[in-house]
Amino acid sequence: MASELCKTISVARLEKHKNLFLNYRNLHHFPLELLKDEGLQYLERLYMKRNSLTSLPENLAQKLPNLVELYLHSNNIVVVPEAIGSLVKLQCLDLSDNALEIVCPEIGRLRALRHLRLANNQLQFLPPEVGDLKELQTLDISTNRLLTLPERLHMCLSLQYLTVDRNRLWYVPRHLCQLPSLNELSMAGNRLAFLPLDLGRSRELQYVYVDNNIHLKGLPSYLYNKVIGCSGCGAPIQVSEVKLLSFSSGQRTVFLPAEVKAIGTEHDHVLPLQELAMRGLYHTYHSLLKDLNFLSPISLPRSLLELLHCPLGHCHRCSEPMFTIVYPKLFPLRETPMAGLHQWKTTVSFVAYCCSTQCLQTFDLLS
């Protein structure tokens, strides 16, 4: 087997192959033949799935500098080394079905990376530097142990497909609603109890799957007329069992994001002072300066400055930004034309988040 492997690599070196297939070779170590002398300078695609590799060499980028695709699916790799960041031409990296516990921050240096697959590992967090991957189109981090997603993920402006199924997420950063190219978002089998108010506001986002998040009872009304999966959501549970802000209408109850400070009703006549001030600041700086960076960080607490950059949400009726208070209105999915598509497998409601009593009274999901 060793001689056959050496022969395969030698032929690839002599004939300057661009593709090399080393799948199913029972390899426990990265082949030294690949790293000899100058390495394989012409190699662009390396396939090494279903081996028993536990690590990657530190000089990988030096010996294989022109790698465009690296497939290491189904090995036993525990750590993505710092050296991976030197593969500056890499566009596809597949480390699915390994034993990954750590992804090094240097992965953010892979500025050409378009597809990153890290499914079926043991990751508890992703480094913030993932947000530096401006060309990233596909990110699959399903079946890990993630509790949160890095907020800088919203800086991946080319991201189209994000899959985070079967993790331990209990919330989704509202900043992800700013992803301009996101077309499909799958978060099935997590611990979500609420979704960002603006999820679905982007016209690019067409597919959202949140199946089997049993505490999830409300979907932002922006998701109406999108392709959604929500089977197994909205299981009966006592509100007191979940320490989250909730809103009830009739026999329906939904949980709201922790950033919501107050829930308005149709009987309110005046907005809270902080909400009025934030809306005024927002419109002033957007209309006069066109750039919130002109606002000195010293003038406002960091939390409020962040809200100005990324509001809690936008009114589902008039698109007015909201910062502290929302006026919710429920539309049970079973009472909409979409009921037949879900075959009664869910008890969730669409939630319209409005900015005022006027918008609350005039909003109609079905009109």
UniProtKB/Swiss-Prot annotation:
Repeat recorded as keyword: yes
Pfam families: LRR_14, LRR_8
Designated gene of the protein: LRRC28
Source organism, top-level taxon: Eukaryota
Repeat (LRR) residue spans along the chain: 16-36, 42-63, 66-87, 89-110, 112-133, 135-156, 158-180, 181-202, 204-226
Keywords of this entry: Leucine-rich repeat, Repeat
SUPFAM superfamilies xrefs: L domain-like
GO biological process: intracellular signal transduction
Alphabetical list of PANTHER family matching this protein: LEUCINE-RICH REPEAT-CONTAINING PROTEIN 28, PTHR48051
Keyword Transferase annotated: no
Lineage of producing organism: Eukaryota, Metazoa, Chordata, Craniata, Vertebrata
Name the UniProt record assigns to this protein: Leucine-rich repeat-containing protein 28
